[in-house]
């Protein structure tokens, strides 16, 4: 079972937002309580945080799927749902986050560095938040927005001060074991080390420094031979490169100078930046017969190249102390010369005044609408609710989508795609269309509403044509149907029952009927009185 993993594929899923609640307040003696549906909670984020106690990506190797909790739905009585908890994933220092296409998202260096890998979805608004002067009691609520889904590649680049590089079996693991308290696996066969071994070394009064034992490199490592690419990335962050050369090798065609040239060529081929790193040379295994003589022979050539050379023996610890002091001094000098890490600046870029909220482009035989607002509105719309669909249509119309579609020549019935939803577009006609007849919220022509009964104007005209000698006792009929036609011009999905503009409560209907009966009785009394006066007057004239 692996104990060190430096590359994994992580499938992150943020929490979905909670749905809003569509609820009406119910309380004794309050028949028109109004909407009281609460908002849904926000979905949890998936966050990566650098933890110094974590040194490997092993946990994600066994658990590659990570999901944050979703937001709770809203409830009645204006109770909002709880937000989902963020999922905190600890990662080692030096973790690089990449997309599936290899694009780098973030380089996490330093304890506490954090990155939001996937953001949770917004919670849907309840009908209490959707109420307005025109829509006083919405019978719908917004759905929670889905959380983000992301497949990311996590790569660990070891953060160390010193990198020990060289051919397999050059003695790198043995050297790191005597420089520090690390206990790597040591054997007499190539590629014993398959993962970097880290150790913390101390020398004199200098601060401690970190040493990384990089697995062995061979010719073609920069092209991936011998897992070269997996090993070379652990050198990128090291500030000092130490070439460990085997002076006791018996392989034909190999000697310390040749090995140095091969490793230098692979480093330069992998990254040009590595060619500029400070470096020194360690001639290892001088305890082996004839190895010390070979070390003395090549030392002059190495120093002629401007390299510091140290001859050591990991077995007898000869020269190890001097090497450790030199490494500590070099690391301290490099740390002092390194520029301080600047704090990340948060740049706020204001949105342009004339920047459109959406774009409409031709897409096959239809049109494609892109934009954060319309796509979010579609995701949060409950398409099983007619009022919610009408609300979406109103929002798109106010945003100017209909005007843009009409400008581009869209006709009724053409397919329009917004996000993952495709529908047939039916233009909403304003007043004056269809010969002056506007459309109500449900698509019915306003002039057809109440056409079976005369309105107030028709009743007044009819009353004027009656005989002036016969008074009209009944008052003008309330234009209830006309009011209904006017109210239907409001946005689709408005609740006329609670608005009080169209439908009357039982008490109001009874009061109106009572007033009508009283008016009829008064009119009958006036008619009887006028008839009696006429009869009396006629008798007087006859007597006269």
Curated annotation (Swiss-Prot):
Keywords: Cytoplasm, GTP-binding, Hydrolase, Magnesium, Metal-binding, Nucleotide-binding
Disulfide bonds listed in the record: none
GO molecular function, one term: GTP binding
Highest taxon, organism lineage: Bacteria
Disordered, as annotated region: 63-86, 456-544
SUPFAM superfamilies: Obg GTP-binding protein C-terminal domain, Obg GTP-binding protein N-terminal domain, P-loop containing nucleoside triphosphate hydrolases
Ligand binding (Mg(2+)): 173, 193
Binding, GTP: 166-173, 191-195, 213-216, 284-287, 313-315
Domain Obg: start-end pairs: 2-159
Cofactors, names only: Mg(2+)
Subunit text: Monomer.
Family, similarity comment: Belongs to the TRAFAC class OBG-HflX-like GTPase superfamily. OBG GTPase family.
Role, per record: An essential GTPase which binds GTP, GDP and possibly (p)ppGpp with moderate affinity, with high nucleotide exchange rates and a fairly low GTP hydrolysis rate. Plays a role in control of the cell cycle, stress response, ribosome biogenesis and in those bacteria that undergo differentiation, in morphogenesis control.
PANTHER family: DEVELOPMENTALLY REGULATED GTP-BINDING PROTEIN-RELATED, MITOCHONDRIAL RIBOSOME-ASSOCIATED GTPASE 2
Protein known as: GTPase Obg
Organism in which the protein naturally occurs: Frankia alni (strain DSM 45986 / CECT 9034 / ACN14a)
């Amino acid at each position: 079972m692996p104990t060190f993993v430096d590359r994994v594929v992580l499938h992150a899923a943020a929490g979905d937002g909670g749905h809003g609640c569509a609820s009406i307040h119910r309380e004794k003696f309050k028949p028109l309580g109004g909407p009281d549906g609460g908002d849904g909670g926000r979905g949890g984020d998936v966050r990566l945080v650098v933890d110094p106690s974590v040194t490997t990506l092993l946990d994600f190797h066994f658990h590659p799927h990570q999901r944050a909790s979703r937001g709770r739905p809203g409830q009645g009585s204006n109770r909002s749902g709880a937000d989902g908890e963020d999922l905190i994933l600890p990662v080692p220092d030096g973790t690089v986050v990449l997309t599936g296409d290899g694009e780098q998202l973030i380089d996490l260096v330093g304890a506490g560095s954090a990155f939001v890998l996937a953001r949770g979805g917004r919670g849907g608004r309840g009908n209490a938040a959707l109420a307005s002067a025109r829509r006083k009691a919405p019978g719908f609520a917004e759905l929670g927005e889905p959380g983000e889904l992301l497949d990311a590649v996590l790569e660990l680049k070891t953060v160390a001060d010193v990198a020990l590089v060289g051919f397999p079996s050059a003695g790198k693991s043995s050297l790191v074991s005597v420089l520090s308290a690390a206990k790597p696996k040591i054997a007499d066969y190539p590629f014993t080390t398959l993962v970097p071994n880290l150790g913390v070394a101390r020398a004199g009064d200098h601060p401690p420094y970190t040493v990384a034992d990089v697995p062995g490199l061979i010719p073609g490592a920069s092209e991936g031979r011998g897992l070269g690419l997996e090993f070379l990335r652990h050198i990128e962050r090291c500030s000092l490169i130490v070439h460990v050369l085997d002076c006791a090798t018996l392989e034909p065609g190999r000697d310390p100078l040749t090995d140095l040239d091969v490793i230098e060529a692979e480093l330069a081929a992998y990254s040009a930046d590595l060619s500029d790193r400070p470096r020194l040379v360690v001639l290892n295994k001088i305890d082996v017969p004839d190895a010390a003589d070979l070390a003395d022979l090549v030392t002059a050539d190495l120093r002629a190249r401007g390299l510091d050379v140290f001859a050591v023996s990991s077995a007898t610890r000869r020269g190890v102390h001097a090497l450790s002091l030199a490494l500590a001094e070099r690391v301290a000098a490099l740390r002092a010369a390194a520029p301080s890490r600047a704090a990340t600046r948060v740049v706020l870029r204001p949105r342009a005044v004339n920047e459109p909220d959406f774009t409409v482009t031709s897409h096959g035989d239809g049109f494609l609408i892109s934009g954060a607002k319309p796509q979010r509105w579609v995701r949060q719309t409950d398409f099983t609710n007619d009022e919610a669909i009408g609300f979406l249509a109103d929002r798109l119309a106010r945003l100017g989508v209909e005007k843009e579609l009409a400008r581009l020549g869209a006709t009724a019935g053409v397919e329009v795609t917004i996000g993952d939803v495709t529908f047939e577009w039916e233009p909403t006609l304003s007043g004056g269309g269809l010969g002056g007849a506007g459309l109500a919220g449900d698509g019915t022509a306003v002039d057809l509403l109440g056409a079976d009964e005369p309105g107030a104007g028709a009743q007044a005209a009819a009353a004027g044509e009656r005989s002036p000698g016969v008074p009209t006792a009944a008052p003008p009929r309330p234009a209830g149907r006309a009011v209904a036609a006017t109210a239907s011009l409001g946005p689709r999905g408005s609740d006329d029952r609670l608005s009080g503009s169209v439908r009357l409560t039982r008490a109001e209907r009874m009061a109106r009927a009572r007033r009508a009966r009283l008016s009829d009785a008064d009119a009958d009394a006036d008619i009887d009185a006028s008839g009696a006066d006429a009869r009396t007057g006629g008798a007087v004239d006859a007597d006269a």
